[in-house]
Regions:
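Glycine-rich phosphate-binding loop of nucleotide-binding enzymes
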Residues: 50-56, 63-66, 73-85, 176, ...
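P-loop NTPase motor domains
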Residues: 75-86, 298, 396, 409-467, ...
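Anion (oxyanion) recognition and catalysis
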Residues: 180, 392, 503, 523, ...
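H-loop/switch region of ABC-family ATPase nucleotide-binding domains
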Residues: 728
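Short, flexible loop motifs at catalytic/binding sites
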Residues: 472-489, 525-527, 676-682, 687, ...
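Extended, folded cores of ATP/NTP-driven motor/assembly subunits in large transport
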Residues: 1-444
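P-loop NTPase motor core of the ASCE superfamily
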Residues: 139-142, 147, 471, 553-608, ...
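The start of beta-strands in P-loop NTPase/AAA+ ATPase cores
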Residues: 57, 149, 508, 650, ...
Length: 847
């Protein structure tokens, strides 16, 4: 028994006063296991641009994913993995199919929010639809979810160690250079971005508003990384994650935040490791591990984090061990008992290959490949079956990591490997020995097409990646588009969505339609619908559209105007065939003389008079041929006097169906409208995008002079920031008229929807579309899935991608050509509802 003065004092106090100077029990402590205790992060060194962690240091890069690969890709990756990393370093490659799609949807929503009105309502409805795709499949038959693929590459080294800050910086520069050589963009992931990434991994509940993760440099990173409102229950074969469902869902008209409930808020997180891999694997086959491109059933039903963890051991020891293995297996394979062990010969050959690769400069690495899935609670078993089926179809075998679920989640965190996780995995026998070139071939760096930088058309890839596409992202060539899709492929909806997308972003749109498919949508969007009939009384005199002063000062402008006017006159004179060289010369002389004499006050009558006064018989024949378009002729009223209207509206649709029986007039009216749009382009700012869309172009662009006219128009459009879009049911239709063929040949972009099988065979046989076997397979696989989505193949400068157009009920109601739908909307407006409210009611969404 130990006696002390304090004990004696307590005994005396207890005896005299029945009390002591100290409490009867020690003070209670709150004991909670914190997920942040597993994180390595401490501080960020701004000078060295390195993270200094508890037991390591390193850097983190965010990289654009690879879109496919080839042998060169594998060689470059293998070379860097073999030579660019020092001994003891730990490399992590994380491919995260994130449920946070706000970085794509937000910039697309912003310009439409600024436009307000119907375009803001369309954007809100589309945003809700895409966010719904995150957790609910957009297809009733197969998984189809929206995902934003993020590729994170991190390199860390243990501390203390022999690798200096300067060596790490050199590794970073070498890694960035290697990625740039593959055509990938890489940028440093700073603390704010790292905190956001950890939040996406540990709190996947998706709200419309992006959470702001401000980095406080005066506090440790680990204490800022994990939200305080999540709960993680660790099981033997899963993690049960509970998050806060009350999140900011948007802001009202006054800018005040609105907080709503976001579901799901309970998740089943499971981790798997690779048990076996195929004997042979190429870098481009990694695309199969993000979801099959052609089989809908083999797509991921939930967010996943795929990780490759590499540890670079002592190469001398590793080489010595490899040499021993080679000698041992070789000697055993040459014994008499080898016939009872047939795999000995294979093992000997494999170690011989390893020995040769090591002598060639390759390295042996310790490797771990795993996958973590994040499913809404209750769906984990169904999702596990699909995930394992995807890997099994590619020849891989996944196994549950029982009792290692938390370690699997931590393995997804950048820089965790060098901070002690590598030692844990080595102790648990989770690291396999592989060649560095093999590791490069299986690196999970594949993703889907990310789109361009101009947020016009919003599409979703087959594996779920939302992306933007715009014809104006082509900086090297023109912005023109050729669109083809068979009946029932969704072509009409795509055309209307293209126009609404451009208008919502502030562009000016003119449509020349044949069939009234745009009538209701243009009226609902506040545009102008113009019908051409013989009794309409419109004037389209091309001379009156020209700016006199500018034509006098700008020679290029004047020549472009003359070229189009001459093509219009040529179309009047020879509607079925192209004018001869002599006739072109006579028309040129007559148009020039008329302009010099009368300027913009001239008319087709004056050109006819000049032709009639020429000395040649051909000139008088031309004057007679264009007589129907002169005063007193059948169509003279359309081209007399000053043009009766200007393109002042941002969205205008010209309906030509009433002129279908008069093809000679329709082609001239069409060319006059195109000339009017070209003049509107020259008068507006080049920063404003402009689109002219012609539906059923093969029929509309018939005529002898239309080819020449379209070529001139395409050149003018490119110069003034405009685009010409033409649409037909088949690519073969473009070859039915000179004008349509000229439109195709002057289009750098092509959008192909579902086609007939025999049509695709014609493409290949007649070499009308430059495509290899893969492109042909992609086009053959295009489909439309009812009202769920329609697929479009985008082919353009350095671009080949498949996107799905996903409509919301609000947009589908606007684009509907059903007269009853339009009448119902008007009826709701008469009852006092706003336009957006009326559309929502008819669409079935209530107020």
């Amino acid at each position: 028994m130990t006696l002390s003065l304090a004990a004696a004092r307590d005994a005396l106090s207890r005896g005299l006063f029945a009390d002591t100077t100290r409490p009867e029990k020690p003070q209670a402590h709150f004991g909670l296991d914190m997920l942040s205790d597993w994180l390595p992060y401490r501080v960020y060194d701004e000078g060295a641009k390195l993270y200094r962690n508890a037991r390591s240091k390193g850097f983190v890069l965010e990289v654009t994913p690879l879109i496919g690969a080839d042998e060169r890709t594998g060689e470059i990756l293998g070379q860097f993995f073999s030579e660019g990393l020092p001994q003891g370093s730990c490399l992590q490659v994380l491919n995260f199919a994130s449920p946070r799609i706000g970085s794509v949807v937000g910039p697309w929503f912003a310009p439409r929010y600024e436009q307000g009105g119907i375009y803001e309502a369309i954007a809100r409805a589309r945003t809700r639809r895409l966010y719904d795709l995150v957790w609910n499949s957009g297809s009733a038959h197969a998984p189809f979810h929206a995902r934003n693929v993020r590729l994170i590459v991190s390199l860390g080294v243990p501390v203390p160690g022999s690798v200096t800050d300067a060596e790490l910086s050199e590794c970073r520069e070498g890694l960035v250079g290697m990625l740039h050589s593959l055509g990938l963009h890489a940028q440093e992931l700073r603390p704010g971005g790292l905190l956001a990434l950890i939040d996406e991994l540990t709190s996947p509940t998706t709200a419309h508003e992006t959470d702001i993760h401000a980095w406080n440099p005066h506090d440790t990173l680990q204490s800022q990384a994990i939200r305080r409102d999540i709960e993680l229950e660790v099981g033997d074969d899963r993690l049960i994650l509970r998050t806060e469902r009350f999140r900011e869902t948007g802001r009202d008209e006054e800018g005040n935040p609105e907080v709503g409930e976001c579901y799901p808020d309970h998740f089943d997180v499971r981790h798997y490791a690779v048990r076996s891999t195929p004997e042979r694997w190429a870098p481009w086959e990694c695309a199969r591990l993000i979801g099959d491109m052609f089989t809908d059933k083999l797509r991921f039903p939930c967010p996943t984090a795929t990780m490759l963890c590499l540890v670079y051991p002592d190469q001398e020891a590793a080489s010595a061990r490899a040499g021993f293995k080679f000698m041992r297996t070789t000697s055993l394979s040459q014994t008499k008992s080898a016939r009872f062990l047939p795999k000995l010969a294979e093992q000997s050959a494999e170690w011989r290959h390893v020995q040769a690769e090591l002598q060639a400069g390759k390295k042996l690495v310790k490797l771990f490949y795993g996958l973590t899935s994040i499913s809404p609670l209750g769906q984990g078993d169904a999702h596990e079956r699909i995930i394992k089926a995807i890997y099994k179809a590619a020849g891989w075998d996944l196994a549950d990591e029982r009792f290692l679920q938390l370690q699997g989640l931590v393995a997804a965190f950048p820089l965790s490997l060098a901070d002690g996780l590598a030692d844990d995995m080595a102790r648990l026998k989770r690291l396999k020995t592989m060649l560095s070139t093999t590791a490069a071939h299986i690196a999970p760096m594949q993703g889907e097409y990310l789109g361009g930088v101009i947020p016009h058309l919003l599409l979703v890839g087959r594996r779920g990646q939302p992306f933007w596409w715009s014809p104006f992202e082509n900086t090297a060539g023109n912005h023109n588009i050729a669109i083809c899709g068979k009946s029932g492929s969704g072509k009409s909806v795509l055309l209307q969505e293209l126009c609404a997308a451009l208008r919502g972003a502030g562009a000016k749109v003119v449509v020349i339609d044949d069939g009234r498919s745009f009538e209701h949508s243009v009226k609902l969007q506040g545009g102008r619908f113009v019908e051409f009939t013989l009794a309409s009384g419109f004037s389209l005199n091309p001379f009156s559209m020209v700016d006199d002063a500018r034509a006098h000062e700008d020679e290029d402008y004047r020549l472009d105007c003359f070229a189009m006017i001459k093509a219009i006159v040529g179309q009047m004179a020879r509607p079925g065939t192209a004018p001869s060289d002599t006739e072109r010369g006579l028309i040129d002389r007559a148009v020039t003389a008329t302009w010099e004499a009368l300027g913009s006050g001239a008319s087709v009558d004056d050109v006819a008079h000049a032709l009639h006064g020429s000395e040649s018989e051909a000139g008088r024949d031309l004057a007679t041929a264009i007589a129907p378009f002169c005063r007193g002729g059948s169509y003279g009223g359309f081209f007399a006097g000053k043009a009766s209207f200007a393109l002042d509206d941002d969205f205008t649709v010209f309906e030509m169906s009433d002129l279908a029986s008069r093809e000679e007039l329709r082609s001239v009216v069409l060319s006059a409208i195109m000339f009017m749009t070209s003049q509107a382009m020259t008068r507006s700012s080049r920063a404003t995008k402009k689109l002219l869309l012609i539906d059923e172009a093969w029929a509309m662009l018939k005529g002898g002079s239309m080819g020449e006219f379209v070529e001139t128009y395409a050149r003018t459009a490119r110069k003034y920031g405009g685009a010409l879009a033409t649409a037909t049911q088949s690519l073969n239709d473009y070859y039915k008229s000179d004008g349509a063929r000229a439109a195709l040949e002057n289009s750098d972009w092509m959008l192909v929807l579902q086609q007939k099988a025999e049509t695709i065979a014609d493409f290949r046989a007649n070499a009308r579309l430059d495509m290899d076997d893969r492109t042909e397979t992609l086009i053959r696989s295009l489909k439309r899935s009812g009202t769920e989505y329609s697929e479009v193949f985008i082919k353009g400068p350095e671009t080949e991608a498949v996107g799905r157009l996903v409509l919301d009920p609000f947009s589908a109601t606007i684009y509907s050509s059903d007269p009853d739908t339009y009448a119902a909307i008007q009826d709701c407006e008469r009852r006092g509802h706003s336009l957006a409210g009326a559309i929502r009611i008819v669409a079935g969404g209530g107020q």
